[in-house]
C-alpha cells in the first residue's frame, strides 16, 4: 500500500481506554499527568471517560462503554484521522466479551500508525517525549490511492 503523510497537531486528540481491572491504573496515570493532558483534547470510552471527568474535572468526550460499542467508536475516529494518540490499558489476564472489538481497535491504531500505549511505562514514554507537544508527521495509508486502485 502506498503511504502519505499526516501531521499530528501540537494539540493532540488523545483516546483513553481501560478495561475494568485497569481503570484505577489509568486514573492514577491521568491524575499524575493532568497538567499535560489538560492542554489536549480527550476522548474515552463511556465508563472510563465519566470516571476521569468526575475525578479531574477535565473535559472528556465520552463514547459508549467499550462492551456497548465504545471501542468501535474510538476505532472509527482513528480511521477518520480524528485520534492522534491511543492510551489503552487492557487486561491481558482476563478475557472480555468484546475481545474482537479490542483486537479491531488495536489493529486500526496500527494501520493508521498512531502512537499507542498499552501500559504505564509506554504511556509515560509517550507523554514525556520531547515531541509530545510538537506537530509531528506520521506515515499513514494513502486511502485515496488505495480506493482508486480498487476501482480500476
UniProtKB/Swiss-Prot annotation:
Superkingdom of the organism of origin: Bacteria
GO biological process, one term: methylglyoxal biosynthetic process
One term under GO cellular component: cytosol
Gene Ontology MF terms in the entry: methylglyoxal synthase activity
PROSITE patterns: METHYLGLYOXAL_SYNTH, MGS
Active site: 71 (proton donor/acceptor)
EC number: 4.2.3.3
Keywords in alphabetical order: Lyase
Residues reported to bind substrate: 19, 23, 45-48, 65-66, 98
Disulfide cross-links: none
Enzyme class: lyase
Record's catalysed reaction(s): dihydroxyacetone phosphate = methylglyoxal + phosphate
HAMAP family: Methylglyoxal_synth
Xref: NCBIfam families: MGSA, PRK05234.1
Name this polypeptide is given: Methylglyoxal synthase
Amino acid at each position: 500500500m502506498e503511504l502519505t503523510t499526516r501531521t499530528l497537531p501540537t494539540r493532540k486528540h488523545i483516546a483513553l481506554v481501560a478495561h475494568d481491572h485497569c481503570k484505577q491504573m489509568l486514573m492514577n496515570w491521568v491524575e499524575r499527568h493532568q497538567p499535560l493532558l489538560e492542554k489536549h483534547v480527550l476522548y474515552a470510552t463511556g465508563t472510563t471517560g465519566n470516571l476521569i471527568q468526575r475525578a479531574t474535572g477535565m473535559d472528556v468526550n465520552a463514547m459508549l462503554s467499550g462492551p456497548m460499542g465504545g471501542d468501535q467508536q474510538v476505532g472509527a475516529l482513528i480511521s477518520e484521522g480524528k485520534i492522534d494518540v491511543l492510551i489503552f490499558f487492557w487486561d491481558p489476564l482476563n478475557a472480555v466479551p468484546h475481545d474482537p472489538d479490542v483486537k479491531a481497535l488495536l489493529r486500526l491504531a496500527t494501520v493508521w500508525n498512531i502512537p499507542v500505549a498499552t501500559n504505564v511505562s509506554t504511556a509515560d514514554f509517550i507523554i514525556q517525549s520531547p515531541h509530545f507537544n510538537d506537530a509531528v508527521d506520521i506515515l499513514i495509508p494513502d486511502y485515496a490511492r488505495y480506493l482508486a486502485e480498487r476501482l480500476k
